């Protein structure tokens, strides 16, 4: 293993000089002797000098310190030993529960599966959230994006999906916290303990591995932590489960993909690259592709991923969310307008889409009900301007009916969440897809036109709406 010395330090960027015939390769991990600091090679500048990004704080480092080339990229522990543990970007434990006992370590830089190895799935993944199951259904082994500005509920929606899917789905999950709040990571860990997904008595019985690179960490950590989490998920997908003899079906949760892009922007600027549109790095599409192409399903197992995507200034045309759109099978768009009406989850039923919304995949009935709901909501959206100027009285009877039904649909798309019980006091509801389709089919057919729209708000199934309406009727009498 070759060794060199630090010749320049600018924040998180360090230049290291090696002998000309021992220059490290791009992405090689270097260890600063006598410290915990790991560096990753980003550029070869010539004359034996490489430019690196520090995976951690550079406090206390100085010029002429000795650096050793590890001879390979950053590697992280993989396998059953990672379950129930919280690790950093380098796979080091940060939960104060002792070392991670793993038999293998995998490099975080890996080739994406070849076209021949990939497999398609049209099997639906039921989430128990009405608006998602009806209008933007998820595929097993698919990629889902939760798009939204600040404070519209991306993390809460993701937590509910973890609660509904990961707890019912018997497989394993990996959670990558990329540049998010430490408080949220802490809350998530304790929620997983309460739910029994993390078993601190016997980690081998746990169902989730957690990798965190939070907001307060240097850009190198935030840029690579998504790859560390993905590598752990790939191991479960690609290695045979002793019980079944084939790869596992894994859930990968990434919160937040925008922070991954932002860390790339910071690193790009530190490396002296010329910025591109809106100040983003010129390699934005390539970096996003390198990550997303690896999140896929193969013949041996599947990775179903749910990714939260922050939308800066609520602008979906911003280069970062716009680049992410191209890679996803389903997009759940969270709207500030809907959140301001108190309707949660604040999913925009007209903007959210899914490739699975096809009669050949989900069946004629589901497809027709979903399109019927969207048709009513779209017509209501068009009528809003007329109502604002002339009032409801100027509408035809047919249009009035559309408005009343649309308002009921809007409210019925809201739902109390299990993870929000502590804040709202309302018990969470899991609504099976079969019930969701039947309920909305009846609403657009006019079967519940006589019920007040308040009864539809924050209800689970349609039976609950009917019971609420009866209660309101008796209390008014």
UniProtKB/Swiss-Prot annotation:
CDD domains: ATP-synt_F1_beta_C (cd18110), ATP-synt_F1_beta_N (cd18115), F1-ATPase_beta_CD (cd01133)
Documented EC number(s): 7.1.2.2
InterPro entries: AAA+_ATPase (IPR003593), ATP-synt_VA_C (IPR055190), ATP_synth_F1_bsu (IPR005722), ATPase_a/bsu_AS (IPR020003), ATPase_alpha/beta_chains (IPR050053), ATPase_F1/V1/A1_a/bsu_N (IPR004100), ATPase_F1/V1/A1_a/bsu_N_sf (IPR036121), ATPase_F1/V1/A1_a/bsu_nucl-bd (IPR000194)
Primary subcellular site in the record, as a coarse category: membrane
Enzyme class, broadest EC rank: translocase
Positions with a binding annotation for ATP: 148-155
SUPFAM superfamilies per the UniProt record, alphabetical: C-terminal domain of alpha and beta subunits of F1 ATP synthase (SSF47917), N-terminal domain of alpha and beta subunits of F1 ATP synthase (SSF50615), P-loop containing nucleoside triphosphate hydrolases (SSF52540)
Subcellular location: Cell inner membrane
GO cellular component, as recorded: plasma membrane; proton-transporting ATP synthase complex
Membrane-topology annotation of the record: Peripheral membrane protein
Family label: Belongs to the ATPase alpha/beta chains family.
HAMAP family: ATP_synth_beta_bact (MF_01347)
Assembly and interaction partners: F-type ATPases have 2 components, CF(1) - the catalytic core - and CF(0) - the membrane proton channel. CF(1) has five subunits: alpha(3), beta(3), gamma(1), delta(1), epsilon(1). CF(0) has three main subunits: a(1), b(2) and c(9-12). The alpha and beta chains form an alternating ring which encloses part of the gamma chain. CF(1) is attached to CF(0) by a central stalk formed by the gamma and epsilon chains, while a peripheral stalk is formed by the delta and b chains.
Function noted in UniProt: Produces ATP from ADP in the presence of a proton gradient across the membrane. The catalytic sites are hosted primarily by the beta subunits.
Name of the protein: ATP synthase subunit beta
Organism this protein belongs to: Psychrobacter arcticus (strain DSM 17307 / VKM B-2377 / 273-4)
């Amino acid at each position: 293993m070759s060794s060199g010395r630090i010749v320049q330090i600018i924040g998180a960027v360090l230049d290291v000089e090696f002998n000309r015939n021992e220059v490290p390769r791009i992405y090689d991990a270097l260890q600063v002797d006598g410290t915990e600091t790991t560096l990753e090679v980003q550029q070869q500048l010539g004359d034996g000098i490489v430019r690196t990004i520090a995976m951690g704080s550079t406090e206390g480092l100085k010029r002429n310190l000795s650096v050793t080339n590890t001879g390979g990229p950053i590697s992280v522990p993989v396998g059953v030993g990672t379950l129930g543990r919280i690790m950093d970007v380098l796979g080091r434990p940060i939960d104060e529960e002792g070392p991670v006992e793993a038999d293998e370590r995998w490099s975080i830089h890996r080739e994406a599966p070849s076209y021949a190895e990939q497999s398609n799935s049209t099997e639906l993944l039921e989430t128990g959230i009405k608006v998602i199951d009806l209008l933007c259904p998820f595929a097993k082994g698919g990629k889902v994006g939760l798009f939204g500005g600040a404070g519209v509920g991306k993390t809460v929606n993701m937590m509910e999906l973890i609660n509904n899917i990961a707890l019912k789905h018997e497989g394993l999950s990996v959670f990558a916290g990329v540049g998010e709040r430490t408080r949220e990571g802490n809350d998530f860990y304790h929620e997983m303990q309460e739910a029994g997904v993390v078993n601190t008595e016997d980690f081998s019985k746990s169902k989730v591995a957690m990798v965190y690179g939070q907001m307060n960490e240097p850009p190198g950590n935030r840029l690579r932590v998504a790859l560390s989490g993905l590598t752990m998920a790939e191991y479960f997908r690609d290695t045979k489960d002793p019980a079944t003899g084939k790869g596992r079906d894994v859930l990968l949760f990434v919160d937040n993909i925008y922070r991954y892009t932002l860390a790339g922007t910071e690193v790009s600027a530190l490396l002296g690259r010329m910025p591109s549109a809106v100040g983003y790095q010129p390699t934005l599409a390539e970096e996003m592709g390198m990550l997303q192409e690896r999140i896929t399903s193969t013949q041996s197992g599947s990775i179903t991923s749910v990714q939260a995507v922050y939308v800066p200034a609520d602008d979906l045309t911003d280069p970062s969310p716009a680049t992410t759109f191209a890679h996803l099978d389903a997009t759940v768009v969270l709207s500030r307008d809907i959140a301001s009406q108190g309707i949660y989850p604040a999913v925009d039923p007209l903007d959210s889409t899914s490739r699975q919304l096809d009669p050949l995949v989900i069946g004629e009935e589901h497809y027709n009900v979903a399109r019927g709901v969207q048709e009513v909501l779209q017509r209501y959206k068009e009528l809003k301007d007329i109502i604002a100027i002339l009032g409801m009285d100027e509408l035809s009877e047919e249009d009035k009916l559309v408005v009343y039904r649309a308002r009921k649909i809007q409210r019925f798309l809201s739902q109390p969440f299990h993870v929000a019980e502590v804040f709202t006091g309302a018990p969470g509801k899991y609504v099976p897809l079969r019930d969701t389709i039947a309920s909305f089919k009846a609403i657009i057919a006019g079967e519940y036109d006589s019920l007040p729209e308040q009864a539809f708000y924050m209800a689970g199934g349609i039976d609950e709406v009917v019971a609420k309406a009866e209660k309101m009727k008796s209390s008014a009498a």
